[in-house]
Amino acid sequence: MAEKFESLMNIHGFDLGSRYMDLKPLGCGGNGLVFSAVDNDCDKRVAIKKIVLTDPQSVKHALREIKIIRRLDHDNIVKVFEILGPSGSQLTDDVGSLTELNSVYIVQEYMETDLANVLEQGPLLEEHARLFMYQLLRGLKYIHSANVLHRDLKPANLFINTEDLVLKIGDFGLARIMDPHYSHKGHLSEGLVTKWYRSPRLLLSPNNYTKAIDMWAAGCIFAEMLTGKTLFAGAHELEQMQLILESIPVVHEEDRQELLSVIPVYIRNDMTEPHKPLTQLLPGISREALDFLEQILTFSPMDRLTAEEALSHPYMSIYSFPTDEPISSHPFHIEDEVDDILLMDETHSHIYNWERYHDCQFSEHDWPIHNNFDIDEVQLDPRALSDVTDEEEVQVDPRKYLDGDREKYLEDPAFDTSYSAEPCWQYPDHHENKYCDLECSHTCNYKTRSPSYLDNLVWRESEVNHYYEPKLIIDLSNWKEQSKDKSDKRGKSKCERNGLVKAQIALEEASQQLAERERGQGFDFDAFIAGTVQLSAQRESADVVDKLNDLNSSVSQLEMKSLISKSVSREKQEKGRANLAQLGALYQPSWESQFVSGGEECFLISQFCCEVRKDEHVEKENTYTSYLDKFFSRKEDSEMLETEPVEEGKRGERGREAGLLSSGGEFLLSRQLESIGTPQFHSPGGSPLKSIQATLTPSAMKSSPQIPHKTYSNILKHLN
């Protein structure tokens, strides 16, 4: 037993001395870890909640929770026995001493189970649900009379003893004081209630709410006890509001206009008749229970029953006894809120000078910097003398904060009678991890800092967004793999684009050099015609002989044109022969003799060379295409030039020399391509593939980069 106790002390950091033994983990509260232990002084099992004090925010939450639970004393609220420091030391009444500690322990009443575990077994009988609902309302009446908002009511925070069927409200880690005599609009924290139990007003105005938010959560819990499942289980705020609008009527026109300005795509002209009323969601319940629930789950908080009014409803008359439903005799007021601010002001500088642990793994950048007080503490009262801009740190629940900032659509309203409740999600990429908010809550961008989620929708394309579809479970690993694959593809395509551009530049330079060389060697026919026209326009003079001599010299130049043309044709024929050799045409050793003897072959080769130059000119004007596409298109043209049948033996020999496609459709390696030394690829059949730059001239091929083709798709397309 001693070894087990020491191991728990080391693993979880519980340091309470030898008084408390047999520690067992129970779960996580609003802002701490909860264990059960046996108190050796009274031999009784208790629940111990450890709150780690690491920064001013945690100190503020601990101060607030301790202040509230010390004053609350009710049969339906979990009792607190004592508050201890490290090693089980007793704390003084001065709560300011917490700033000198690194942790605090709250020893409270141990309960057998919670309502969430009970509902996992199935729905409750209506009589049991009514009994638990009465106790919940009885506790809420006392809490609200003390000017306290719980702000985190859910089945996991309602504890039950199954022997006597007693229900008690616990976990006040997110509770706060709110004096109803002062306005708190704009100075309340956002999104503290678990999403499934948030009221419509809390979804529309996260910074402006009242005690009615606890009543909405109580109504959702009552419906869950009757059905065994969550009443409104939305994946995000938009879907949560959508589910509410399907079942809860919007009676007031001002509420409909507010919804119309925020989410017009889901708003109809008549919202008083929901598509799925509560009678469909809760089949089989009594009429009195349905009427009771409909008066609690109202869209407008002004129409919602308070805890005291709900206890007076006829459905609760079987248990209701006003004289046994006490209220707080010492409620909190605005002074208690201001005292928290002043206390934090006095100890603010001291908190930041806490010594770091020697084995702490946090860097200087990991410690939050707070230059102002918390916005949650400021009220519209002259006694609140602080200008606060920081926001309250929101505690995380495993079922909260399951979505990012992409939550609302600001689309043009589509008013018609056909109301579609299906949301339109355009992005299929998503990842799934049900504990995403515990792992990446600081980067998920879910905890919005705007006055209203639904009023200020911004599609943030520059930031990583983890949710594109309404999912309750997200997979962070899939998202990381998808983002890695996308970055690899982008890098690869960029590299290939750079290589193709270089090849295109080399091809254009080679074509320009060839054109300049042809212009330098040819006969200037335009100059000859211009001189002849100018000479014929002039009158004959005495110096006729000299002009005739000039004319004769021009004629002699014209006669030399045929000789020059022959040399040019010969050069073109040689170039065409080289191109045909590179393109894999049938190479014949007696090329010269065939050109001299066969006039038809000479004409075809000249025509082919002209078509090649024409194709190059067209390609310069059009958009760039892959060099493999050019290669295969020219190969098809060269195959059309074959007019004479070739013997089967010679054809096989020439195919091996040229390195083109064999009859089986496989790529063979030619001697010319081996000399180029291009990188190799592997086809699905296992035969090696090489990048081919046959369209470049020999001079350009020496300087052009050897770049592999990015896929086999273009090659296989030409094969087919």
Swiss-Prot record:
There is a cross-link at residue 1 (Peptide (Met-Gly) (interchain with G-Cter in ubiquitin)). Residues 647-657 have a biased composition (Basic and acidic residues). It comes from the Eukaryota. Residues 20-316 form the Protein kinase domain. InterPro entries: Kinase-like_dom_sf (IPR011009), MAP_kinase (IPR050117), MAPK_ERK3/4 (IPR008350), Prot_kinase_dom (IPR000719), Protein_kinase_ATP_BS (IPR017441), Ser/Thr_kinase_AS (IPR008271). Keywords: ATP-binding, Cell cycle, Cytoplasm, Kinase, Nucleotide-binding, Nucleus, Phosphoprotein, Serine/threonine-protein kinase, Transferase, Ubl conjugation. The modification Phosphoserine is found at residues 189, 386, 452, 554, 556, 683. It is found in: Cytoplasm; Nucleus. Transmembrane segments: none annotated. Its EC number is 2.7.11.24. It is an enzyme of class 2 (transferase). Atypical MAPK protein. Phosphorylates microtubule-associated protein 2 (MAP2) and MAPKAPK5. The precise role of the complex formed with MAPKAPK5 is still unclear, but the complex follows a complex set of phosphorylation events: upon interaction with atypical MAPKAPK5, ERK3/MAPK6 is phosphorylated at Ser-189 and then mediates phosphorylation and activation of MAPKAPK5, which in turn phosphorylates ERK3/MAPK6. May promote entry in the cell cycle. Belongs to the protein kinase superfamily. CMGC Ser/Thr protein kinase family. MAP kinase subfamily. Heterodimer with ERK4/MAPK4. Interacts with (via FRIEDE motif) MAPKAPK5. Interacts with UBE3A; this interaction may be indirect and mediated by HERC2, possibly via HERC2 interaction with NEURL4. In contrast to classical MAPKs, the TXY motif within the activation loop is replaced by the SEG motif, whose phosphorylation activates the MAP kinases. This is Mitogen-activated protein kinase 6. It comes from Rattus norvegicus.
